[in-house]
């Protein structure tokens, strides 16, 4: 296990700089076996040194590319494939270890109606693109998004939802809540709520682009 200070969602591709000795050992073990390791969010504490508190749900990553430097550090590119749930934490030896359970998104395919999901995902994609375009106009360092192709096959729709989540770049709290949601329909509704909250924030910013400006005081009676 490689706990991190960020939420890694299924479908993500993550660059990692591995410099701490215990995680160098983890990489060496992975490179000798199936190149897979798990990650969860550090809910309290730091990535370096141990003594952290960790969430129970995370992602299973596969090392796609790896380069070891002369001083023993590693640069990795890893892809997240599936959600995992930690059943029990084991002793660090020397890196964090755990017994985990894979939580595939296709456990309940009947919970996904292809026609309904395709329409809802396409609508959410349009709203997210509008949000990002507005944020870029205000100076955010993000790329303007193109249209995301929405599949019609039931098996691909759950993965497409994760692509939309990544496009929104939600807070760690929102991303973790989505990751912990086992039911895909509930996850879609939760994500739609997160998109709406983001829209409300943007509407407030458009109405008052600089709430600290003394030339634009807030009416205390409002």
How should these model regions be labeled?
Residues 1-222:
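N-terminal low-complexity, acidic/polar interaction/targeting segments
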């Amino acid at each position: 296990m490689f706990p991190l200070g960020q939420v890694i969602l299924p479908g993500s591709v993550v660059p990692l700089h591995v410099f701490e000795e215990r995680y160098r050992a983890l990489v060496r073990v992975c490179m000798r076996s199936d190149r897979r390791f798990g990650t969860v969010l550090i809910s309290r504490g730091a990535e370096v040194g141990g003594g952290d508190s960790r969430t129970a749900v995370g992602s299973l990553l596969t090392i796609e590319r790896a380069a070891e430097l002369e001083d023993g550090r590693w640069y990795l590119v890893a892809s997240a494939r599936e959600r995992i749930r930690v059943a029990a934490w084991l002793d660090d030896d020397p890196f964090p270890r755990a017994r985990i359970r894979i939580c595939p998104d296709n456990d309940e395919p009947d919970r996904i109606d292809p026609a309904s999901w395709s329409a809802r995902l396409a609508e959410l994609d349009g709203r997210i693109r509008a949000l990002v375009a507005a944020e870029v106009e205000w100076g955010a360092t993000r790329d303007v998004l193109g249209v995301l192709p929405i599949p019609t096959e039931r098996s691909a729709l759950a993965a497409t939802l994760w692509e939309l989540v990544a496009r929104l770049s939600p807070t760690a709290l929102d991303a973790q809540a989505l990751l912990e949601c086992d039911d895909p329909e509930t996850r879609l509704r939760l994500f739609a709520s997160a998109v709406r909250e983001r829209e409300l924030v943007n509407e407030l910013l458009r109405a008052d682009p600089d709430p600290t400006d003394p030339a634009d005081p807030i009416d205390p009676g409002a």
